[in-house]
């Protein structure tokens, strides 16, 4: 079928023309140090966009990916860029442009963290900082440079940011960038790059001006559309237990323990300190629990996760960091020892991917101070959290 113009597609959506999926990082044939960095960063398996977009980028295709934030897109292009560069070549080989300073700095942090074992230097070129500092940093030839369009264009024109070794040009949040009036700078940057530079464009929406960039500057691009997986509270019974004061939560949990271990449960606390404290207290009462949070070494987290997945550990105490990372499809009970500090995390803790259609029970410990937050959560998700019945064990 002839490639139909992207312009004909309905309401700013692109149509995928690439269906290959690589569902583990191990199968991506990444450099050993990079793979180590990916796992150390806390990833266990690739998200939908990572499964689809990393391989074509590594293989050298131009890629258009339509994906919302929260889908794992930053890591998608960071991993790809780290795989493609030669760390020993002191010259810019991958250039990433983002619409805001904050986003550029965030991307830089991700690149440095995932590239930790490759000793990669990644420089952020952003407005509002001294040009002198940029010039000095760029003279050292960092292999990956990330920045905002104005400053990047300026640095290339001054010949401080050299483009002769450039292999990869990544535009993140292209729709944002063009709607903020950076079109001219973006076009200028394209003109200043070597003809053969591979182009990767990421955008949540595909308005006309973004499509024009893809037609003008991209060669036969792979198109990937990733819809954000909708989490749902459907099929999940939500209860609360009124706890007069914080100190009583521990006894409440101990009373529930028999019920809890009928199946596997995840217990969420709001801080790492609380996770450690609760783990100690429960262990002292001879309850078997495992704990996991961001302060732990990745290898340790992997072991705990493996034990939990295999069912040899039944109760996992964790922080929100893991709410998004734990594939808790097999978990039918979640206890919020602390209500989440922000309501968005509530659905990450207890929600389920619609296609799994899993049943489940969530129990929220609620002190007088938490009532307002609970009402907010109910309103935000248009859901009902009811007082826990006596026969909760029958529902799990």
Curated annotation (Swiss-Prot):
GO terms for cellular component: cytoplasm. Its main location: cytoplasm. One of its GO terms (biological process) is cytoplasmic translational initiation. It is found in: Cytoplasm. Residues 54-224 form the Helicase ATP-binding domain. A motif (DEAD box) lies at residues 172-175. Its EC number is 3.6.4.13. It catalyses: ATP + H2O = ADP + phosphate + H(+). It is an enzyme of class 3 (hydrolase). A motif (Q motif) lies at residues 23-51. The keyword Translocase does not apply. ATP binds at residues 67-74. Keywords: ATP-binding, Cytoplasm, Helicase, Hydrolase, Initiation factor, Nucleotide-binding, Protein biosynthesis, RNA-binding. GO terms for molecular function: ATP binding; ATP hydrolysis activity; RNA binding; RNA helicase activity; translation initiation factor activity. It holds the Pfam family Helicase_C. InterPro entries: DEAD/DEAH_box_helicase_dom (IPR011545), EIF4A_DEADc (IPR044728), Helicase_ATP-bd (IPR014001), Helicase_C-like (IPR001650), P-loop_NTPase (IPR027417), RNA-helicase_DEAD-box_CS (IPR000629), RNA_helicase_DEAD_Q_motif (IPR014014). Residues 235-396 form the Helicase C-terminal domain. Component of the eIF4F complex, which composition varies with external and internal environmental conditions. It is composed of at least eIF4A, eIF4E and eIF4G. Belongs to the DEAD box helicase family. eIF4A subfamily. ATP-dependent RNA helicase which is a subunit of the eIF4F complex involved in cap recognition and is required for mRNA binding to ribosome. In the current model of translation initiation, eIF4A unwinds RNA secondary structures in the 5'-UTR of mRNAs which is necessary to allow efficient binding of the small ribosomal subunit, and subsequent scanning for the initiator codon. The Q motif is unique to and characteristic of the DEAD box family of RNA helicases and controls ATP binding and hydrolysis. This is ATP-dependent RNA helicase eIF4A. It comes from Aspergillus terreus (strain NIH 2624 / FGSC A1156). The lineage of its organism: Eukaryota, Fungi, Dikarya, Ascomycota, Pezizomycotina. The gene is tif1.
């Amino acid at each position: 079928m002839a490639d139909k113009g992207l312009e004909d597609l309905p309401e700013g959506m692109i149509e995928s023309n690439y269906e290959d999926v690589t569902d583990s990082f191990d199968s991506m044939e990444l450099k050993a140090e990079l793979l180590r960095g990916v796992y150390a960063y806390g990833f266990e398996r690739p998200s939908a966009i990572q499964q689809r977009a990393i391989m074509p980028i590594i293989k050298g295709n131009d890629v258009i990916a339509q994906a919302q934030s929260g889908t794992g897109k930053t890591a998608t292009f960071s991993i790809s860029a780290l795989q493609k560069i030669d760390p020993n070549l002191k010259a810019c080989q991958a250039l990433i442009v983002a619409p805001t300073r904050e986003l550029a700095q965030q991307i830089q942090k991700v690149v440095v963290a995932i590239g930790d074992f490759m000793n990669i230097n990644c420089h952020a070129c952003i407005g509002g900082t001294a040009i002198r500092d940029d010039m000095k940093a760029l003279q050292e030839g960092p292999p990956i440079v990330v920045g905002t369009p104005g400053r990047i264009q300026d640095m290339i024109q001054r010949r401080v940011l050299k483009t002769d070794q450039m292999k990869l040009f990544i535009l993140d949040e292209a729709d944002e960038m063009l709607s903020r009036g950076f079109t001219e700078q973006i076009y200028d940057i394209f003109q200043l790059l070597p003809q053969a530079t591979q182009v990767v464009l990421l955008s949540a929406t595909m308005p006309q001006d973004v499509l024009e960039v893809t037609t003008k500057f991209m060669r036969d691009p792979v198109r990937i559309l990733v819809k954000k997986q909708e989490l749902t509270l459907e099929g999940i019974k939500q209860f609360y237990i009124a706890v007069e004061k914080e100190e009583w939560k521990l006894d409440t949990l101990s009373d529930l323990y028999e019920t809890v271990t009928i199946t596997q449960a995840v217990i969420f606390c709001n801080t790492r300190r609380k996770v450690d404290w609760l783990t100690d207290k429960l262990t002292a009462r001879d309850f078997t629990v495992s704990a996991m949070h961001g302060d732990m070494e990745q290898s340790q987290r992997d072991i705990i996760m493996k034990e939990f997945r295999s069912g040899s550990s039944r109760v996992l105490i964790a922080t929100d960091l893991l709410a998004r990372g734990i594939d808790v499809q097999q978990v039918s009970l979640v206890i919020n020892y602390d209500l989440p500090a922000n309501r968005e995390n509530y659905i990450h803790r207890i929600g389920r991917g619609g296609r799994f259609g899993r049943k489940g029970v969530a129990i929220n410990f609620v002190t007088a101070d938490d009532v307002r937050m609970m009402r907010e959560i109910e309103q935000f998700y248009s859901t009902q959290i009811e007082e826990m019945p006596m026969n909760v064990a029958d529902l799990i």
